[in-house]
């Protein structure tokens, strides 16, 4: 009887170990599948920018961006690089409150990376892109932009706060460069810095 009991015990132990191993494997798979950020986002962002780095005159510009972001890669790791990439395109409308010109309209395309840590509602990010647009230039005024057509460079860094599964709030710092890349002489480019806030809807 003892050999039979020992045999039955070994079989039961083997079955239990297989069952628990299966559960552990399923939990591991589920944990890896859990990080699946939304594929598409729309954001409305605004900022207030100040001229810096030897501006031709004192500039203060309001910035309004309507942005679509598309996820194109997820970094699934336990380290600080855990996160995802996004391609974005922004429509830009900027009233110039203080400066020679009065407005700037354009677009910008680029990339954004979001650092997502487990169990945190705060998501640090940085982004950068290039684009073009039009400004109501006054080339006859010293220090003004030399022509209407102007290139732009944007870079930003900040933090998103996850409100719920669909909505996020963003706060950060923004840099913008406006220039016609030497198509006129002189070419008094603009360098602008300032705070930025926004709201994002994901789906």
Describe each model-derived feature in a short phrase.
Residues 22-39, 72-85, 99, 116-123, ...:
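Short loop/turn motifs that connect adjacent beta-strands in outer-membrane beta-barrel proteins
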Residues 64-66, 190-203:
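Outer-membrane beta-barrel "beta-signal"
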